[in-house]
């Protein structure tokens, strides 16, 4: 072991299986390609090693081998439908009517409220072209009451385009 390796705890992290140097990390979400860049988002709590107030971490790659860490893409927003966490979801580049030239990066995820943590709403986050900023959020569907299941079983699962 070199002195540099000893001083950098991330030097032994796997290179092809993404891990994070800090906090709780969970399943990948919103994996998609925008232009020549792959975007992988993942459930992450950067403040603790506990599964709590989940953010969406973000890494990018041109070749799916070498990865670059980006700032968190989605974070819980106080007083909003995702104030207790940003859970599972999907990602895509919207090229439909009204989208920006080249498409609008869009993430759709389950948001959980502090006041009702057992209920999840479908939230749409739209971003800028390089996906470094998601700043337009819309609650697309409030927590549904699915007969026989209740609103606590809802999760955003799949989107398709025509």
Model-derived regions: residue spans:
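Beta-rich carbohydrate-recognition and catalytic domains
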Residues: 1-162
